[in-house]
């Protein structure tokens, strides 16, 4: 099995992106799966283009994209991505699409086909705070998750794909009072455990993972 895992470069005035740094730290072989790492730009369209180029090059079985979600307390596999770009801030090339569909011929939303609840269970069972997230936002993270799942739906039907958001690391919250963070080692461990769960689970487990609101 080949797993392509991507991480964004820093954005929004940050000098580091824990998503990318954690991706760099994970092993290149997990439960017999080959792990291929890719840095992508925090830029609308270009991020997707780079991922599709890599898909064409290596023909992966799984594509997992990792992004930073400052303010979250744990590692959060995403359930769904929506067909909407609505950028609160500019991306790294100054683009700021507002209320624009990602793909005009795409569905309103695409759901991850990764075993997200099994991933959460694997992390929690090993001491990593984790939960299912039901929104990937409307910035480049959602753009990438939706775009990859669109490509899976249209062209690469044998690929399993999804997205994981990770918290800030401690150095990022020094001047952000009351903002949660997680060590880069724990984030990397969470990603490793998530890949383990993907390798070991063709189908997701049935367990509570929803939210009231």
UniProtKB/Swiss-Prot annotation:
Molecular-function annotations in GO: pyroglutamyl-peptidase activity
One matching Pfam family: Peptidase_C15
CDD domains named among the record's database cross-references: Peptidase_C15 (cd00501)
Transmembrane regions: none
Catalysed reactions listed for this entry: Release of an N-terminal pyroglutamyl group from a polypeptide, the second amino acid generally not being Pro
Compartments it resides in: Cytoplasm
Catalytic residues (positions): 78, 141, 165
GO biological process: proteolysis
UniProt keyword annotations, A-Z: Cytoplasm, Hydrolase, Protease, Thiol protease
Gene Ontology cellular-component terms listed: cytosol
Role this protein plays: Removes 5-oxoproline from various penultimate amino acid residues except L-proline.
Family: Belongs to the peptidase C15 family.
Record's subunit section: Homotetramer.
Protein name per Swiss-Prot or TrEMBL: Pyrrolidone-carboxylate peptidase
Organism: Clostridium perfringens (strain ATCC 13124 / DSM 756 / JCM 1290 / NCIMB 6125 / NCTC 8237 / Type A)
Gene giving rise to this polypeptide: pcp
């Amino acid at each position: 099995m080949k797993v392509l895992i991507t991480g964004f470069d820093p954005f929004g005035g940050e000098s580091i992106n824990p998503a990318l740094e954690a991706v760099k730290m994970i092993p290149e072989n997990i439960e017999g799966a080959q792990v291929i790492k890719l840095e992508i730009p925090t830029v609308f369209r270009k991020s997707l283009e780079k991922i599709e180029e890599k898909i064409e090059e290596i023909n992966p079985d799984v594509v997992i994209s990792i992004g930073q979600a400052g303010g979250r307390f744990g590692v959060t596999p995403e359930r769904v991505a929506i067909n909407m770009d609505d950028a609160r801030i500019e991306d790294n090339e100054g683009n700021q699409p507002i209320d624009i569909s990602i793909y005009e011929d795409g569905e309103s939303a695409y759901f991850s086909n990764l075993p997200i609840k099994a991933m959460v269970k694997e992390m929690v069972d090993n001491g990593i705070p984790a939960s299912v997230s039901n929104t990937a936002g409307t910035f480049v993270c959602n753009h990438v998750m939706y775009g990859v799942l669109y490509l899976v739906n249209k062209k690469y039907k044998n690929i399993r794909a999804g997205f994981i958001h990770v918290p800030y690391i401690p150095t990022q919250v020094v001047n952000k009072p009351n903002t949660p963070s997680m060590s880069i080692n724990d984030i990397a461990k969470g990603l490793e455990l998530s890949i383990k769960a993907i390798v070991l689970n063709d189908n997701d487990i049935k367990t509570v993972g929803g939210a009231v609101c």
